[in-house]
Amino acid sequence: MDKVIARPYKRPNALCRLICFPWAGGNCSFFIRWCEAFSSIIVVSVIRLAGRECRDTEPFPEDMAEVVNEITNALLKDLQEKPFALFGHSFGSFVSYALAVHLKEKHGLEPVHMFFSGSYGPHSEYFHLMYKLPEVEDSRLLELIHTLGGTPPEFLQNEQITKHLLRVLKEDQKVLVTYPWHDVRKKYFSCDLTCFNGSDEKNHGSEAWIAITSGDTSIYSLPGNHFYLMEPSNETFLIKYITKCIENSDI
């Protein structure tokens, strides 16, 4: 489990698990600090995909099915023992959705809450822009990464780091487009769902996520760009909001 799931704090007496999914090209580093930031009733786990961090010598996943199966194998026992919630940012939202579908279809499990951050809903017209990423030149991709934020500027000045970042980003995009997004079922879930986005980002399309559940839904626009969650005040809001949602759920 340790290579797939980062979980510095075990918290055996916690009442609920929060599984966090990083963005495309990302790693565990941002969400690791959430492991300590949440109250003792919540134990945080962060997904670590192959091809990065301590798994940088492993081959990248071939498709979403491989990603979902690996995460399921690592987490299933834990998820069967305690209620769980999912938080994904950008690409991580899509991975968390695919995992949620798999868990419900194959194991009859459903999260108490799904939190989607900085991502287009799969039913939105903007989602299909993701399929055009392979056509974008590396120089333009680097400009986009710089504009979106989330990556220290000094990293983008390092040729070796940028080369690896671009490869991870492209590999994650390859995984994303292998999923049958045309078959996304409306009202498939009954849990509550919340979407978050940065107010400076255009064309969110996050309203399309609302269609996947019959539970209560909310959308929040927080100050900032795609990586609004890195702003300390926004991060504090997210932690408090997620905690409140979990505390108010049927756990």
Curated annotation (Swiss-Prot):
Keyword list (alphabetical) reads: Fatty acid biosynthesis, Fatty acid metabolism, Hydrolase, Lipid biosynthesis, Lipid metabolism
Q: Which cysteines are joined by disulfide bonds?
A: none
Q: Does the keyword Lipid biosynthesis apply?
A: yes
Active-site feature positions: 90, 226
What general EC class does the enzyme of this chain belong to? hydrolase
Transmembrane domains' residue ranges: none
Family assignment from sequence similarity: Belongs to the thioesterase family.
- PANTHER family, alphabetically? S-ACYL FATTY ACID SYNTHASE THIOESTERASE, MEDIUM CHAIN (PTHR11487:SF0), THIOESTERASE (PTHR11487)
Q: What is this protein called?
A: S-acyl fatty acid synthase thioesterase, medium chain
Could you tell me which species this protein originates from? Answer: Anas platyrhynchos (Mallard)
Species classification = Eukaryota, Metazoa, Chordata, Craniata, Vertebrata
